[in-house]
Structure formats: structure tokens, C-alpha cells
Amino acid sequence: ERRELIRRTWGQERSYGGRPVRRLFLLGTPAPEDAERAEQLAERAALEAREHGDVLQWAFTDTFLNLTLKHVHLLDWLEARCPRASFLLSGDDDVFVHTANVLRFLETKSPDRHLFAGQLMSGSLPIRESWSKYFVPPQLFSGSVYPVYCSGGGF
């Protein structure tokens, strides 16, 4: 499983140069295509949360279209639970992060100033094929080209 691999590699919780690093996994509820396994997946997520203490789960369907909602919940949680946190790195579970390099980069930045770093994307087109996980219906975004944005794997 990807989360376990992250826990054992780059996502180990430890202190880097006296700075504690916390790892969290964000989950919603199983998507409709996982309905027949929903109960099993929920039990596994609850067990994992108890065992590792690093799983946050909210009551919304965990789909690509709800990714913004997932991040809004994370920011609310962070403000309530980690008010002294200086930086947040959000990334997908299919990326590798060189934690020490990220921290070296952040050491050059002031925690008193806003920072948003990532791969800047421009000229991207919305996917209109309904079978794609990246499908964006025209009712949600009617434009033909997205405004400039930072892309995930990590931002």
C-alpha cells in the first residue's frame, strides 16, 4: 500500500535540524465505484488511523472533483490543531519528496511571508470526456482554458 511505503521512506516523522515534521494522510469516504467494498475500506481506514495516528477522514466522497474540499478541510484542521506550523506541503501519494531538500529550501524563506510553491501551469484545457477521472463538466467550469494554477503531485 502506498501510505505504508511513504511511512517507511520519505514520510517518516522525525526532526530535521530541530524542526519536527508531521505526516498526514487525507481521506474522504469511498467513491461510488467502490460501493461494494465501502464497509471493508472504512474498517481498514479506521484501523490504520488507530494504528498510525496519521489519517484524517471526512464525510465526503473521495473523488478528484472533491480534491478542493479535501484541502479546505485540511486547512481548517491545520489552523485548529497546528496553529504554530510554519509550512505545509501537500502532495499526492504517488510522488516522492526529498524532505531534507524541501526543508533546506524553506529555510531560505521567511515564515512571516506567504509562500505558495509548485509547478505553474498555464494553457491547460479542461477534460470533457465523462469517462476520465479528470472530467470537468461545463457546469462546473465553462471556460475553454484554465486560468494559471499550481499543479499537483505537490504544491
Language-model-detected regions and their locations in the chain:
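Secretory-pathway lumenal glyco-enzymes, predominantly type II signal-anchor Golgi glycosyltransferases
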Residues: 1-155
